[in-house]
């Protein structure tokens, strides 16, 4: 289903463009202070706070729009509490908690900048890692808001649909077309997996 992640890709594009500008501005600000260590710590602290705020804002919009776009859907679209709980929970696919990971990335970026002469390279590396995490969690927000829409409307089973584009992994191929209870769907086999779910009438025996 080529359109399943259209909203996701729009959200990722918005966030990537914001992140590029924020990292560039942070790099320029740090350079003006000649990459003073304390200044780098302050610049990266502010940078990652702003990045996390951007993601929270756009992830919530994505979740709410995806919920309404999903058919069938209920009458309780995701709210901020829903999103914060999702981001604070341990994720079996990424193997970490988003709310802790962005802080770890902040600290790692600041440490890397302060411990090397290739400071611009470390800003770029930080951007790359942030963009990857943002993409993974945009997909997760899409999946979970879709499943919430199904559950709120009484859907009990879903079918696993693989992309079938020649790039899917062996696990995704093996799960293609399988029916799962909506509360017992196996975790996706890798971060960013774009297999998707559709309502199913009943479980196949």
Each model region followed by its residue ranges:
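N-terminal leader/targeting and assembly helices and adjacent pre-domain segments
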Residues: 1-145, 153-154, 201-205
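Acidic, glycine-rich two-metal-ion catalytic cores of nucleic acid-processing enzymes
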Residues: 122-205
């Amino acid at each position: 289903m080529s359109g399943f992640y259209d909203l996701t890709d729009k959200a990722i594009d918005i966030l990537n463009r914001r992140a590029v500008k924020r990292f560039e501005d942070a790099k320029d600000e740090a350079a003006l202070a000649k990459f003073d260590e304390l200044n780098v710590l302050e610049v990266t602290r502010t940078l990652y706070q702003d990045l996390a705020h951007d993601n929270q804002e756009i992830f919530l919009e994505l979740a709410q729009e995806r919920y309404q776009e999903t058919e069938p859907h209920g009458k309780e679209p995701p709210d901020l509490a829903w999103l914060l709980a999702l981001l604070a929970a341990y994720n079996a696919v990424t193997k970490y908690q988003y709310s802790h990971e962005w802080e770890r990335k902040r600290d790692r970026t600041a440490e890397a900048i302060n411990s090397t002469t290739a400071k611009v390279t470390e800003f770029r590396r930080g951007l790359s890692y942030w963009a990857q995490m943002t993409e993974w969690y945009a997909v997760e927000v899409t999946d979970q808001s879709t499943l919430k829409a199904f559950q709120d409307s009484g859907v009990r089973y879903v079918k696993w649909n693989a992309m079938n584009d020649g790039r899917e992994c062996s696990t995704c191929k093996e799960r293609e077309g399988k029916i799962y209870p909506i509360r017992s769907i196996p975790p996706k086999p890798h971060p960013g997996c774009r297999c998707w779910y559709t309502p199913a009438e009943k479980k196949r025996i």
